[in-house]
């Protein structure tokens, strides 16, 4: 049983490391968005996706290890950490509790930062769309009617020189 606990501790540490890496990538992306470094923001998307895969892998490994410890403790393989930690040897309880709490806290921070970045990127897109619409007015407007159906209204197109002059 001790061996499976040690493996679970290792898996929790790995998961914690992966969340930390993701938070660092999201922090960097946020700085790049604020600095309007479009190329760097674009490159960060691939890194963030790769890190998301690494997190999923670490999470899956941790779940397998948790199920193994649960089985060793004669519990359901779906037993949550809250049920398992009190059943662990006393020497491992504080460590396991701390790792689980740190993972949960870091996950919350990662989610918050991802939401912040999403809002920043969405706002940047809205501003850019507004600029494009001022430079090149749409040939049609889309408006929802009272029934929630989108109506399309055509506009007279103007040549660029007419819009400028």
Where are these regions (language model features)?
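Short terminal interaction segments
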Residues: 80-165
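Extended, charge-rich alpha-helical scaffolding segments
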Residues: 1-83, 87-90
């Amino acid at each position: 049983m001790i061996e499976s606990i040690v493996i679970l501790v290792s898996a929790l540490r790995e998961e914690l490391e992966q969340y930390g890496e993701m938070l660092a990538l999201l922090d960097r992306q946020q700085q790049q968005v604020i600095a309007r470094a479009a190329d760097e923001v674009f490159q960060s998307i691939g890194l963030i996706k790769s890190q998301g895969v690494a997190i999923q892998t670490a999470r899956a490994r941790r779940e397998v290890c948790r199920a193994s410890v649960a089985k060793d403790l004669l519990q359901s393989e779906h037993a949550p950490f809250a049920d398992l930690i009190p059943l662990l040897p006393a020497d491992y309880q504080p460590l396991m509790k701390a790792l689980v709490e740190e993972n949960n806290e870091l996950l919350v921070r990662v989610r918050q930062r991802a939401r912040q970045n999403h809002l920043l990127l969405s706002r940047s897109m809205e501003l850019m769309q507004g600029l494009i619409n001022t430079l090149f007015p749409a040939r049609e407007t889309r408006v929802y009617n009272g029934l929630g159906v989108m109506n399309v209204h055509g506009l007279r197109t103007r040549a660029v020189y007419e819009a400028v002059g």
